[in-house]
Amino acid sequence: MIGNWNYGTGRRKTSVARVFIKKGSGKIVVNGKPVDEFFARETGRMIVRQPLELTGHLESFDIKVNVHGGGETGQAGAVRHGITRALIDYDAALKPALSQAGFVTRDAREVERKKVGFRKARRRKQFSKR
């Protein structure tokens, strides 16, 4: 806890989110913009709000997020992970419910590297018989 803020770091793919929560009216600000403005797609906004809806704290926290790296979906996942960790920092009793929903575990899937002699990670060069 930093002052009256609770903190959580979230990661997904190459995105990293630093999340600060405190008691408030339910405002979510991501990189200085409201969440509805920052995440253009509805799915991104939905992913970000999932841990708050699950715990019933959608209107009870002001959330300040700093996120960088990756794309829109990765950033949404990182913010969700950060909010989850910040909620656990605020009240450890929320951990079982969040863990049951799968929000506490970091999604370890990363992009597979491109191999030499292949066009992509697994896509081989076209074979020519003649």
From Swiss-Prot:
PROSITE patterns named among the record's database cross-references: RIBOSOMAL_S9
Molecular function terms from GO: RNA binding; structural constituent of ribosome
Record bears the keyword Ribosomal protein: yes
Annotated Gene Ontology cellular component terms: cytosolic small ribosomal subunit
InterPro entries from the UniProt entry: Ribosomal_Su5_D2-typ_SF, Ribosomal_uS9, Ribosomal_uS9_bac/plastid, Ribosomal_uS9_CS, Ribsml_uS5_D2-typ_fold_subgr
Biological process, per Gene Ontology: translation
Position of the signal peptide: none
Record bears the keyword Signal: no
Keywords from the UniProt entry: Ribonucleoprotein, Ribosomal protein
NCBIfam families: PRK00132.1
Similarity section: Belongs to the universal ribosomal protein uS9 family.
Name recorded for this polypeptide: Small ribosomal subunit protein uS9
Species, as recorded: Bordetella bronchiseptica (strain ATCC BAA-588 / NCTC 13252 / RB50)
